């Protein structure tokens, strides 16, 4: 399994695309690396536990944005005593950067970790990231000996779905599935 992880919330939908790209392109003929994503720091505590002490079946790729554009300062809340006062006045960028460094160090002691770094998230850098992953997917599929451009596994469920929903041309399969499902 490969986990693509980042501390950048703007990458949420990018993760979905990345998972689809690699799962659909490599996941055939009993080949491929199962792609998953980690949206840190949100999932760091739960997923981090598995990464630190669970089965060693994962390698991790960090997509690190050196200069995130968003900025927010932690302000004191006099109503709640939660032992997080030491964070008052700190920018979330500083907190995320420290958490990234701590996470990379801890995880790299347990599993292979790689870092892909971009300066900022701009339309140009997004283009670079998309191109990088599309090209690496193409190359890795070639190494695995699979065609990254077909999707036979997807076709199986689509045919069943078409039959069950009554799409013309799928009548025989619909009858076969009806007998199996009841």
Locations of regions flagged by a protein language model:
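A SIS-like phosphosugar-recognition module
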Residues: 1-182
């Amino acid at each position: 399994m490969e986990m693509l992880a980042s501390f950048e919330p703007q990458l949420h939908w990018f993760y979905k695309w990345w998972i689809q790209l690699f799962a659909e392109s490599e996941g055939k003929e009993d080949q491929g690396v199962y792609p998953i994503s980690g949206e840190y720091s949100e999932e760091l505590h739960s997923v981090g536990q598995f990464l630190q002490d669970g089965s060693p079946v994962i390698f991790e790729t960090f997509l690190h944005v050196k200069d995130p554009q968003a900025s927010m300062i932690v302000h004191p809340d006099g109503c709640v005593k939660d032992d997080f006062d030491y964070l008052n006045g700190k920018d979330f960028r500083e907190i995320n950067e420290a958490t990234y460094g701590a996470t990379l160090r801890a995880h790299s002691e347990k599993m292979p970790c790689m870092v892909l770094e971009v300066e900022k998230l701009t339309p140009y850098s997004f283009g670079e990231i998309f191109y990088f992953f599309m090209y690496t997917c193409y190359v890795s599929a070639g190494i695995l000996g699979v065609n990254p451009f077909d999707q036979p596994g997807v076709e199986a469920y689509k045919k069943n779905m078409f039959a069950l929903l009554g799409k013309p041309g799928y009548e025989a399969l619909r009858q076969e599935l009806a007998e199996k499902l009841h």
